[in-house]
């Protein structure tokens, strides 16, 4: 029983440590989602937790939305081959 508990705890830690994080980015423009209220930010948190993003928590960092616990399929800044505002 103790072994099963330890294995479960280790798997939970591995999932937490290896979760993806980064700046939320627009797939069409390659630009970060902007924000102006630094720290805890309802807008960033809502965007990060949106079903199409799948994140666990979001806040405003350096005037852009930073997301934690993202699935690997969610793109984060920078997107290879896309420069924000440059053609």
Swiss-Prot record:
The UniProt record lists the keyword Cytoplasm: no
GO CC, one annotated term: extracellular region
Domain LCN-type CS-alpha/beta intervals: 20-85
GO molecular function: sodium channel inhibitor activity; toxin activity
Alphabetized UniProt keyword annotations: Amidation, Disulfide bond, Ion channel impairing toxin, Neurotoxin, Secreted, Signal, Toxin, Voltage-gated sodium channel impairing toxin
Propeptide: 85-87
Domain remark in the UniProt entry: Has the structural arrangement of an alpha-helix connected to antiparallel beta-sheets by disulfide bonds (CS-alpha/beta).
Family per similarity comment: Belongs to the long (4 C-C) scorpion toxin superfamily. Sodium channel inhibitor family. Beta subfamily.
Name used for this protein in its record: Neurotoxin Cex2
């Amino acid at each position: 029983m103790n072994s099963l508990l330890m294995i479960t705890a280790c798997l939970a830690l591995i999932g937490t440590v290896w979760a993806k994080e980064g700046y939320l980015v627009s797939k069409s423009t390659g630009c970060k989602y902007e924000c102006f209220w630094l720290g805890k930010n309802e807008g960033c948190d809502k965007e990060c937790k949106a079903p199409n993003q799948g994140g666990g928590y979001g806040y405003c960092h350096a005037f852009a939305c930073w997301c934690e616990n993202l699935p690997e399929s969610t793109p984060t800044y920078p997107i290879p081959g896309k420069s924000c505002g440059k053609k």
